[in-house]
Amino acid sequence: MYNITSIRSDFPILSREVYGKPLVYLDNGATTQKPLCVLDAMQHEYLNANANVHRGVHYLSQQATDLHEAARTTVRKFINARSDNEIIFTRGTTEGINLIASSFCEGFMQPGDEVIITAMEHHSNIVPWQLQAARSGIAIRVIPIDDRGELILDEMDKLFTSRTRLVSVMQVSNVLGTVNPIKEIVRRAHLHGVPVLVDGAQSVPHFKVDVQDLDCDFFTFSGHKAYGPTGVGVVYGKEEWLEKLPPYQGGGEMIATVSFEKTTFAELPFKFEAGTPDYVATHGLATALDYLSALGMDNIQRHEQDLTRYATQQLETIDGMRIFGHSTDKDAVISFLVGDIHHLDLGTLLDRLGIAVRTGHHCAQPLMARLGISGTVRASFGLYNTREEIDALVAGVRRVAAMF
């Protein structure tokens, strides 16, 4: 049974007030709150096992190393990767995409080669490729979307050429909530011999992800959006691909031997993990993933889908309401505008009512241009949100709308 009262008690911040009002936190697409078990696990490691990993023969270092590598195993199991060697720790999704963009372009792309992305991408899956285009002369091709906010896959098929080297696509839109058909995208790309990178920042916290079932070649996500700490993320890569890619950064730990003439590199996954990792954060991430597993990803998905349907129904009763994104497969995100009210004004006034939402372009300016707007208000739901909080949002929007 999904006991929302018990779940909410795991998150102390949810009981606080803002401007004298109960906090209604609906900005989970930006970051999630952290359960006590995560905070306790990280504090316990700092108090009892704080030492650099993989470098010391002393007890604390070995204990910290064991926790760090156990976290890698937890991540591997959570996304059903085949091997711990396929799990690379990063600072987050953005660094993960930059890692693949840099290493893949260096190893496998020539001037004039092409990468395919989509019209709904977050800037973190646009700008890294633009940087590579400026440095290496690669070209970027874009899969368009229809008016429902869904990818036009037939148009994607037309983008493949003999120069296509990679497809890089988000699994879930952080603006529209669209859940993209990753398995079908991967199938079509593989027919052309093209690997696929998936941005899973907005999927991992919300529903079960199985990278072997998706058959994607690379997958990346962030800890802080999955109820874990900031500053830690994951790149999954098929081992055969990671073996072939050159390192992203150089430094300690990612080497086998170093001389002034030559450096040889460590085996996977350490080849991509230069320097001291945030070993306490990896332990926190593993604790968060264990928390999600204990609740059950299917249970979380059902709860959030119910919230999304209910919120959509209630918001649509407000005069002047415009919701952006009407995919038949939609995740826990609703972006909207009301009449001529600027999204910043609406979000600011909702904040005075204790309701935390996101306003602006959500790091997706090309998508906003496609929609013909400058930004939206975004309500994004998490495993601890309730229908009562949706009611508070709807009442708040009505109250603000009445002021204009």
Descriptions of predicted regions:
Residues 1-404:
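Pyridoxal 5′-phosphate
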